A protein has these predicted regions:
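A helix-coil-helix interface module used to build multimeric assemblies
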Residues: 2-239, 244-258, 265-274, 338, ...
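Amphipathic alpha-helix face/heptad-repeat signature
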Residues: 56, 116, 170-177, 216-223, ...
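Generic, well-ordered alpha-helical scaffold segments in large soluble proteins
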Residues: 63-70, 126, 130, 165, ...
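Glycine-rich cofactor-pocket loops
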Residues: 186-217, 329-345, 375-383, 408-423, ...
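Conserved helix-loop functional segments at active or binding sites
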Residues: 187-190, 233-236, 240, 279, ...
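Active-site-adjacent "gating/activation" loops or surface patches in catalytic cores
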Residues: 267-295
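A conserved active-site cap/scaffold subdomain adjacent to cofactor or substrate pockets
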Residues: 290-396
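Long, amphipathic alpha-helical stalk/connector segments used for oligomerization, subunit docking
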Residues: 353, 357-443, 447
Length: 524
């Protein structure tokens, strides 16, 4: 047999040459940029060193422009640092320095940095070089980065980066997966024509043992509810109503007291200027800092992200079980091979791998508690952590993508569901016992134990038990009918339908609110 035919390919398909992107991915030092690049590629536009430098350069220039405006209000004893505000043309030209930041600029930065051994100094040298003669060079050299420490820029850049990760990468992914959970709850509830039940019911398990029947829709609604409760943390409620999560920004010098700026230009309310500048960047100004802000809010955000991973980990556990029990099955193409040696298998390898990526992410995000432990008034242990943020968030993105891949090709296995239900009529025993106890039958629990001990429980056996109770006058015909009815499993699900309706409605409402708050286009 032609080996390519097994994969649905031909010789013509093999006539290919690698693209530069292919070569980059095949030689990547980590799976993020290699095997899993399809899941993490959007992060490159947010967390790469190139983007970090561009964002830092942008903040330096916006600070410079704002400083030019602010000095028009300064009436203190010293000459103004910038005598007149920048013109509209100068502002546009200055902003183009960071808006047009290119790969060539990045390489130039890398040429400068080893000489200075300081990334912020190197960036400012490049900024001055690229500004050229936009405005007076002496003014630029005097005013750029004036009164600032590196952390005044880097702390804000990190907060902006994290907010962009959440808004453009994480939130669209997690809300998309939540929509899938909600959609599968509805889709899997429906049954094919001719099916003996009006909706899909499975045998619920507790402690890995068969317990009571439950609609598959309610199973999925519970997953959606757990995730919904975690996602609620991303809605910040205050006096101004609901808001997206906003991180802190800081500007206060080396130890948070703004010593350098206030020494140079005393008697001026620089804090109000910083607040307006930071808020214009989309952050909330935090004046109470040392070299960095406390990072408590970013840790709160990371805790929320970690919590949202736990419902996904539960789903990963359950998904494998539902497949192995035959409750769910995956649609596969004819050329798909689930195992290299066992032809009967189609392994849930994407979901199983997703669980590992989430465990990595939760462990990595836990390390970020170090952000709150800087030595004395400041050190650079935080710097490495901040550069690393794409790794845990990339792991989460990979996991969400893999969960979605498997979920999208999964359907109920109706034959397997019915086989399991027929093999385990004991899932009606709890309701049977309660009906008998309510009817006043003494020792109802022990009666059922004795009737079924050591035997394979069948609906016919239970009907015999009921008929014996009716014939012996221990229960009336109506009670006997109620007992028999619970062996029709869709009639023995309590208020599951109503609860699922409520839960799924609440979960979808949260999705829509988060989409509005974070500016995410609705997928429906």
């Amino acid at each position: 047999m032609d080996p390519l035919a097994r994969a649905g390919l031909t010789e013509r398909d093999m006539d290919i040459q690698p693209t530069p992107g292919d070569i980059s991915e095949m030689h990547a030092s980590t799976p993020h940029d290699g095997r899993y690049a399809g899941y993490t590629r959007p992060l490159r536009g947010i967390t790469s060193e190139y983007q970090s430098l561009k964002r830092r350069l942008g903040l330096e220039i916006e600070y410079l422009i704002a400083l030019g405006d602010e000095f028009q209000h300064y009436t203190g004893p010293r000459p103004r640092l910038i005598d007149t505000p920048f013109t509209d043309g100068e502002r546009r030209a200055l902003r183009r320095v960071y808006e047009d930041f290119s790969e060539v600029d990045f390489v130039r930065f890398k040429k400068i940095e080893p000489k200075t051994d300081h990334d912020v100094v190197a960036m400012n040298i490049l900024a001055l070089y690229n500004m050229g003669d936009i405005v007076d060079a002496a003014v630029m050299e005097r005013a750029l980065h004036f009164g600032r420490t590196s952390s005044d820029m880097d702390s804000n850049v990190f907060s902006l980066t994290v907010q962009e990760i959440v808004g453009k990468y994480y939130m669209p992914a997690i809300l998309g997966l939540q929509r899938m959970f909600i959609g599968k709850a509805e889709e899997w509830h429906r049954v094919p024509d001719g099916y003996p039940r009006p909706f899909t019911v499975i045998a619920g398990q507790t402690h890995e043992q068969y317990a009571v029947p439950t609609p598959l829709r309610k199973v999925m609604a519970n997953i959606a509810t757990e995730l919904d409760q975690a996602l609620d943390s991303f809605i910040v409620r205050g006096t101004e109503g609901e808001q997206p999560f906003r991180l802190y920004g800081k500007m206060g010098g080396a130890v948070g007291n703004d010593c350098a700026m206030m020494a140079a230009y005393p008697g001026y309310n620089w804090r109000d200027f910083y607040r307006r500048l930071i808020e214009s960047q989309g952050l909330e100004y935090q004046p109470a800092t040392d070299q960095d802000e406390s990072n408590m809010r970013v840790l709160e955000l990371f805790d929320a992200i970690r919590r949202a991973n736990y419902p996904l980990l539960k789903w990963g556990d359950d998904y494998s079980s539902y497949l192995s029990r035959g409750v769910l099955t995956r649609k596969t193409r004819s050329e798909v091979r689930g195992s290299s040696i066992m032809p009967q298998k189609v392994n849930p390898w994407k979901t199983e791998g997703a669980e590992v990526f989430l465990e990595f992410a939760n462990a990595e995000l836990g390390v970020y508690g170090r952000l709150a432990r800087q030595r004395k008034q400041g050190d650079l242990t935080r710097s490495a952590l901040k550069r690393y943020i794409g790794v845990p968030m990339g792991n989460i993105g990979i996991a969400i993508g893999r969960f979605a891949d498997d979920l999208g090709r999964t359907v109920p296995n109706y034959d397997g569901i019915e086989t399991e239900l027929a093999a385990h009529p004991e899932i009606s025993a709890a309701s049977t016992q309660m009906i008998l106890r309510a009817a006043g039958v003494p020792g109802a629990y022990d009666l059922l134990v004795e009737a079924t001990k050591g035997k394979r429980v069948t609906p016919e056996m239970m009907r015999d038990v009921v008929q014996g109770l009716v014939g012996g006058g221990r229960i009336d015909e109506a009670t006997g009918s109620d007992v028999v009815a619970v062996f029709t499993h869709e009639r023995n699900i309590g208020d599951a339908v109503e609860r699922a309706d409520e839960q799924l409605g609440q979960a979808m409402e949260t999705v829509q609110r988060l989409e509005r708050l974070y500016g995410i286009p609705s997928s429906v």
